[in-house]
Amino acid sequence: MKALRYYGARDVRYEAMDDPAPQSVAEAVVKVEACSICGSDLHIYHGHGFSEDVGFCVGHKAVGEVIEIGSGVQRLKVGDKVMLPGAVGCGRCRSCLAGVVNLCEFGLSSCYGLSSKLQGSQAEAVRVPAADMNAVKVPDGVSMEQALLMTDALATAWFGVREADVQPGSSVAVIGLGPIGLMAVDSAWVMGAHVVYAIDPVPERRALAEQAGACG
């Protein structure tokens, strides 16, 4: 398959690499239909990565179609449309079941595309560990483009606003209006905010937030 592979600062190449395959009965392979770029990918591109590895595939935001499953996968079947959250856990330990995947007790805690430990999703296909946990079916009526936002950016924004305990009638200030900040504005409205203040030095970003009803 073809993939984007990292070889050093400002050296990312679109080239061939081995097709992924399940490495255990609990894994799946997903054909990538859409992926996107994160600020973390840009850090890696500029040489501020999380590993000394080179030659690995980057990217951790993707949606696609299940094309292969291990015999132990129960919740998915070939042909399912799925979204792949960037963070990966075992799906069985207390931490994963509590939603704190970063504290996975079996050491599976990782993220696609940060090293060769788990190849990224800016490729034609990607291996999904613990697929019952780490691949989420796309609901009917949701486009793949919409689902892609849920793999990282919108989920991050929603989590942040929820942790801020925004209640109906709240006044909310969102500082920083990049993609996640803009989605935090939308999330605050959904949670019932009375007013949302949008703070950013970039006029174009403030204008986008104002289009969503925020006070710039």
Regions found by a protein language model. Give the residues of each.
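Glycine-rich beta-strand-centered segment in the early N-terminal region that forms part
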Residues: D18-C35, H48-L97, P139-G141
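Mid-domain Rossmann-like dinucleotide-binding core that forms the NAD(H)/NADP(H) cofactor-binding site
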Residues: D140-G216
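Short glycine/threonine/proline-enriched tight-turn/helix- or strand-capping micro-motif at secondary-structure
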Residues: D11-D19
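Short alpha-helical
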Residues: V12, I37, G91, M133, ...
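NAD(P)H dinucleotide-binding glycine-rich loop of Rossmann-like/cofactor-binding domains
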Residues: R92-I175
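Cytochrome P450 core scaffold surrounding the K-helix E-X-X-R motif
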Residues: S40-H46
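Short Gly/Pro-enriched turn/cap motifs at secondary-structure boundaries
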Residues: Y7, D19-P20, D53-G59, G113-Q119, ...
